[in-house]
C-alpha cells in the first residue's frame, strides 16, 4: 500500500508527517471525513475494528465486504477517488472470541483475516495479545507473536490468491488499557518502555522468520505502543513528551517502522502535533468524532425544542435515553455511580458509548425527523450562535450553509482539522 509506505519513508527522511485513521462506521462521520480529505487533496485511511465488522457481521451487522461496499459507495457519491481510500482492519485476531478455547478462537481469527484481506483491506493490525479461555494470563510475547505470524501467513496467501500479489502493510503490538477508552477512572498511565517495544518487535521478527515471512518485514510499518495518552469518562491524560523521550528515540533505529498511537481522542492540537513529531506517526481517532456528532445533534435538538411544540418535535434526547435504558448492554459495565452520574455518562461521557446506539431504528427515525423539522425553515441565526458558535461564525462569513446536515458535518470536521494539521504540518479550511 504505497500511500502508507511512502508516508513512512518521508517521515524517516525527517519530515514531521503522519496519517490519521478514522475509526468509525457512522455514515455522517465518514461523509465528513471523505469530504474533508477531498477538499484537502489527501488520502484517507478508514479503519474497521474486529468488534464492528467481522465475517459474522460484528455489532454493525456488516462483513468486511459489506463495509468496503458501504465506504466505496459513499466515496463514489462524493466524487472521492477510490485510489485515495485506504481501508484498515484494527485489532484483528481472537479479540471477539476470548471466551472460547484458543484453538477455536484462532480458527475464527483465521477466517476473520481472510475475510478482511479478500475484501480489499490493505492495512492489517495483527493483535493476538488477548488471552483465550484456556490461556495463561498474560500471554508471553512469544505466544502472541506466533499467533500473529500465523495470521500474517494467511493474509499473504489470501492477498496473492485474490489480487495476484501482496501489497499489504502490517501493524503489530497493542496498547494498554483496552481498546476504546479505559473502563475505570485514570490518574496516571505507564508509557511503554523501549525494552518492551524491542521485545515485541524481536519476538515478532523471530516468529515471522519461522513462518518463512522474513521478506515481508519491511511492510510491517507500525508498532502499537502506549505513549501515555488515554481518556476515561470525564478525564483526559495528556501527552507528556518528556515521558516518551526514550521510547521515541528507540524507533529511530528501525528504517521502515513508526509508532501507531491509539486513544489519541481529545488530545490538544499541540499534543497531536508533538506525537507525530515524536514518531507516533499513525494517529487513531474514533470516539472523538462520534462525540462531535453527538454534540451537534444535542445542539440541534435544543434548537428544535426552542422552535417547535413538543408534540411535533423529534424528541431525540428522550428517545435516545429510553433506548439506552431498555438495552443497557453497551454501557452498563462501563458507567458507574448513582443514577444521576450514569445518566450524565450516557449522554456526555468521553468514552461515548452512545455511539453504539445510533443505528437503532427508533433513534434513527428520531434523527431523521429532527433533520426534517429543522430543514423546513431557515434556522434562526441567534439560535445557531447560541448552540453552535463555531459554525455560526462560518455561516455569517458565507462559508457554511445553515442546514442541519451541513452544521453536523462542519462540527465533526473541526476535530478532523486538528488531526490533519498534526499530520500535514498545515492548517486547512473545512470542506
UniProtKB/Swiss-Prot annotation:
InterPro entries: Aldolase_TIM, GatZ/KbaZ-like, GatZ_KbaZ_carbometab, TagBP_ald_KbaZ. One of its GO terms (biological process) is D-tagatose 6-phosphate catabolic process. Pfam families: GatZ_KbaZ-like. Disulfide bonds: none annotated. Pathway: Carbohydrate metabolism; D-tagatose 6-phosphate degradation; D-glyceraldehyde 3-phosphate and glycerone phosphate from D-tagatose 6-phosphate: step 2/2. Gene3D superfamilies: Aldolase class I (3.20.20.70), putative tagatose 6-phosphate kinase domain like (1.10.400.20). Forms a complex with KbaY. NCBIfam families: agaZ_gatZ (TIGR02810), PRK15458.1 (NF012002). Component of the tagatose-1,6-bisphosphate aldolase KbaYZ that is required for full activity and stability of the Y subunit. Could have a chaperone-like function for the proper and stable folding of KbaY. When expressed alone, KbaZ does not show any aldolase activity. Belongs to the GatZ/KbaZ family. KbaZ subfamily. This is D-tagatose-1,6-bisphosphate aldolase subunit KbaZ. It comes from Citrobacter koseri (strain ATCC BAA-895 / CDC 4225-83 / SGSC4696). The lineage of its organism: Bacteria, Pseudomonadati, Pseudomonadota, Gammaproteobacteria, Enterobacterales.
